[in-house]
């Protein structure tokens, strides 16, 4: 039977001082002091090393952020250079188009110069033919005059033999000649005054015509400038739309790149953290193994060792959880900072682009308003010149009708000496009365044809405009209203300019024909007085067709109602 004193006693106070309640060594036991100091030194070294690695990771993260910002700035610079190159390309393309248009205009100018030279040569030939005919007529008149001179000389010899009768006849003839000379001098004075007045009126009309042509050229140049500005506005709008589309695509690409970059950075950071965690865990496991082996060698109490190891593992788990939470928080903060920087940069670029576009649109609007005011002023001046020309035409018509009513006075010779006076004194022949000429008819027909061409061109333009509007509406429903509103003013301006140019050209041709008619350059259309009524009826029918055409043009083009009303009033005055 064993001695009870040989068995270990758990109630011994010495054992209680050495071992704890669970059978392990107490933490403040001298045997564990060296182990605890060694563990403390190892933990502090690990903590210092982890802090240094954390600083290195933070520095690497800052450097990566700086490189990313530098890449973003460089990408923005490349985008600016790309935009400048695109603008230069578009400017070069516009220059090439302008050069092509200039070459076409030069070719057209050469063709028109050839036509003008041909027309001038034809007119020179016509003038030469007229001069030749005039010379032949004068030669025939000279021969007739020489024959009359021979007859007069024979009659003079016969009259010398009849002295007494001739003296009485001569006295009566002298009295009648004085009366006729006085009447002739009065008529010649009146004709000279009338010619001077007509010459002054012709000079005034030519001055007004030159002013009208000058204003018309200015108006056409302004119209061309307005068309160019409208084309530039359409082109700028297309560029804005293209830029917006490109900006949207670039934003989508940038968003995708940002997402991919964030995903890549997150994966890289996660991989780095995983590698660091794995490395730390491996080192910790190695340290634990070394520590456990050292503890197992130094102590004999397994329970105390297992308790200390369990506490150490729990402490390490807590440290790992805290470190992971800190890393995740830093990652979230870095992502938020990157998103904030990207958003601020994008907003600043959008603000600058929007400001530039607004300024450009304001400049275009001011330029268009200035051109519209200039066009209105030019139209007012043209209307004023047209009214003045109408007044001068009416004055000239009134003076022409007054000149037709005046006839030269001639005293009838005595019946006894009628045959003698026919042989001795030359008869005064009144000037021919101007009648409707071929130039007037041709000008009227030309005016009618120009009006028909203008209506045809206007219909073609309107049909093309509607077709373009329908096409644009089918292709882009959202921008159909804007396109139609831009196309309608340009079509109306083109049709109004075309009609005004044709009206001015027809008016100029009509004034030139009237001037040639007054100068006696045209022969009468109707030489027989009986056929004047028939020709007058034809002219009335043509005038009625012109009036109907003008009425249709006024209904088809309401923006020309004011000018067409003036033309219709003038036609009504001519009819009256």
From Swiss-Prot:
Q: Per the record, where are the segments of Low complexity compositional bias? A: 465-497
Give the UniProt subcellular location, in the record's own words: Cell projection, Cilium, Flagellum
State the post-translational modifications.
Asymmetrically dimethylated at Arg-246 and Arg-523 during flagellum resorption. Probably methylated by PRMT1.
Sequence similarity = Belongs to the CCDC40 family.
Summarize the subunit comment.
Answer: Interacts with CCDC39/FAP59.
Please explain the role this protein plays, according to its UniProt record.
Required for assembly of dynein regulatory complex (DRC) and inner dynein arm complexes, which are responsible for ciliary beat regulation, by acting as a molecular ruler that determines the 96 nanometer (nm) repeat length and arrangements of components in cilia and flagella. Together with CCDC39/FAP59 forms a 96-nm-long complex in flagella.
**What protein name is recorded for this chain?**
Coiled-coil domain-containing protein 40 homolog
Instruction: Write down the species.
Output: Chlamydomonas reinhardtii (Chlamydomonas smithii)
- Encoding gene (name): CCDC40
